[in-house]
Amino acid sequence: MHFIKIAVFFIVISLLFTGCSVTTPKTTETTSPSVPPISSIRAQDDFYGYVNLETLQGTTLEYGQTQAGSFSNIDTEQQLLDSMTRIVSSSEVFPDGSCEQIARDAYLQYLDFQADEAAIINACHAVEAELDKINNVQSLDELMSMAEELRTDFGCVTLSNLAVTMDYFNPDEYGIAWMQATDLCGVPLEEVDENTYLAEQYEKRIIDTLRVMGYSYEAAEGVAHNLMLMIIDVAWATNFDIANAADPFSYTSFMSSAEIDAALSHLSVIDFELMAGIHDNPYGGWLIMDKGQLTAIDALFDESNLEELKALVAYDFLAQYGEYITSEHSIYEEYFPTSQESIDLQAIGYIHQIFPLVLSDLYVKAYYTDDMDQQFSRMCEDIRESYRELITDSDWLSQETRVLLLEKLDNIRFVDGGFCLEQMKDDPSLNDVFGANVFETQRNVAMREHAKSIENIGQPRNRLALGRQMHLVNACYGYDNTVTITVAIMGAPFFDANADYFTNLGGLGAVVAHEVGHAFDSSRIKYDANGVYNPLWLSAEDMAALESRNEVAVDYFENSFTVFDVYRVDGELTLGENYADLGSMECITNIASTDDEYILLFENYARIWCELTLNTNVIDQLSEDEHSPATIRVNAILATTDAFYDIYDLNEGDGMYVSPDERISRWK
């Protein structure tokens, strides 16, 4: 197998394209690096570059930007600003509890607050009052009661990582889960686990938190240093395979309260539940991801660590409400710098923070049309039907397994703009959370959300409840077998109601098919037709056949493609996403039939991944991100698609050519 040198549009001193190398002169005192312009790229050598060359050569990064492309070019901020301007300037009386009424009142409250010095000072004093309570704590019991108060009254998660969430073993129910912490006091646990000397750079904010509370610098420094040693202990006990896993929930197990109590040496199950504001647990235990980390955190609860734990609680509280103290505590300004955005955009950001689903509803009403809904619904069903054909024809799997996979396919539910419009209703009770100023409103919203989560305990879970905001450019597959496609991603080049069907199929259709493909990727394949984690739901023989394909796919993506002629993708890390891309392309090409349809589809598929990004970003992505770089998502997928060879007449020797015996498939 020869190595395919993918052309990558990154900001580097030299650009290397398949079949064409740019010789860069060595830098001397009189010469500087230069890149001759590239006028054209052959589709057969680098399809990503062939489609996107002109766009990328005309793209520049603004100051501070690290990338720009199709995803970032959808200007939802301006769309929301336009909608808000219409609402605020309107003389219409909106229904009580409507998204228009709530958004308008929150917007105006934010503007009023920013112009009211007395309100800003009052908010600062309210935060200081809570810090004084933390400062005056004299025992662990008092501190644990303080943690419960902050969780219940401010929505502040501290000392206890318990949360009411989906039961991963039964998505129609809630469960109480101990979530693995990836950081404490802003300290990335994996980073200090590997390099403890890096911990020192994170001590300053802890020191400044304590100085706000009245500690001298010397006293604050001592407490911060001791707290950092405690955090390192937690890092050493943390299983980072979980945090880095494509499917972290596969590490989850249910432990009874008695089993958890037996594992804890300092606190009890009830102690941790009370700190999370949970007074009743009908489940008789918790879902636990990382037992080792839990026991390490439990070991911190010793009276000798009281000052350090107080610092941790104060840090967590100010991480959520610290912006309100900067007017009187300048040392905290660096953590909440003055926004350079317009006051209008700041107000929209505030609404997104406290009323995200209100903003979501507002966006859907303004930008999702009946025509879009009809076209999108048709596309989703075409994609489902295409997957049905692919799975049915996968005779390398047993008939029994294919029936089960088809059942899972049929059970997939789409959460989109049309679904939101069906579920949308006015909620007058939202007016009850408005306080005298934005601080009080933020606190009241947090209190309401916590109370709602507690009410969910013991109740059935609606897996179709909206979890993603429609004003964010996003798409996702949920472990409970739902696919969410936001309205914000339904802009060009992904989707255009006035474009032809196959252009849209290569854009948004590829995204939808990608998310559906996740239902059958290397990790989600362990979840059954009802979205329940059950690695044994398929026969051992068929699971082995699927896993053998995993090994082939890992080899294909690691050994066939390079970035910068040097770096390779991590085939294991990216396997789930690569499989979703692979299944997506097989699905949408299965819908097309003519050369023109394929061309429209292929070109827009390349177009949606168009991005200009810093080379350092891409190098980091290769080691940290489960997604492959954009060029590989295009070229590596098309290089193993037979129809692509026919349309563009690929032959041995072309940059993207892969011999037939080395091409891979998800379903064929």
Model regions and ranges:
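Short, Gly/Pro- and small/polar-rich lid/capping loops
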Residues: 29-35
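Intrinsically disordered, low-complexity linker/terminal regions across diverse proteins
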Residues: 356, 361-668
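Bacterial N-terminal signal peptides that target proteins for export
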Residues: 1-7
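Noncatalytic, helix-rich "gating/capping" subdomain that lines the substrate-entry/channel surface
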Residues: 85-383
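C-terminal motif of bacterial Sec signal peptides marking the signal peptidase cleavage site
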Residues: 15-19
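Bacterial lipoprotein signal-peptidase II cleavage site
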Residues: 21-28
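Active-site-surrounding "flap" and adjacent substrate/cofactor-binding loops of secreted or lumenal enzymes
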Residues: 42-46, 50-117
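Hydrophobic/aromatic-rich, well-ordered segments within soluble, folded domains that form packed cores
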Residues: 39-57, 192-210, 585
